[in-house]
Amino acid sequence: ALRYPQALACLGAALKAELLRRLGAAGLGHEFVDLGGDGSDPTDDYPDFARRLGHAIRDGVVERGILICGSGVGASVAANKVRGVRAAVCHDTYSARQGVEHDDLNVLTLGARVIGPEPACECALAFLAATFSGEERHLRRLNKVLAIEAEER
């Protein structure tokens, strides 16, 4: 189990509900924090949820999060604007796992219009089960990414 709860924020209400159901049933030992988005408000926009999740990560409320929008791309772009967030769209388990192991990915974004519930759940499980390798080459690259973030903001 991870030290902090996982967060789930999204606009894809049906996919979110299925993820919560399946991830809860998987018995991973994670606590999930719902940061909103049930599809009932037409003024909901993915940047708002991305910022909310990014701040929860930045502030140490959660360790990782999952964002859902139509394609996953917009949510990823918005989340990556928050210092300390490393978000990526992953629609396959290899990328979801490897993103954590090599790049210390802390936000998985999914596209509700692109991926079905079964592969989305498999990606989420791979993302949550993975840990950063800490290998020298991955640390070196991560430190370079963090330096870019510090210099550019």
Give residue ranges: language-model regions.
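N-terminal beta1-alpha1 ligand-phosphate binding loop
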Residues: A1-L23
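C-terminal binding/interaction regions
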Residues: A7, L11-A14, D92-R153
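Short helix-loop-beta junction
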Residues: R21-E31
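Short, high-confidence coil segments that cap the C-terminus of an alpha-helix
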Residues: G29, V61-E63, D104
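A short beta-strand-loop structural module common to alpha/beta enzyme folds
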Residues: H30-P42
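Short Gly/Thr/Asp-enriched flexible loops that form oxyanion-binding sites at enzyme active sites
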Residues: G74-V85
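Short hydrophobic/aromatic-enriched beta-strand-loop microsegments
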Residues: V85-D92
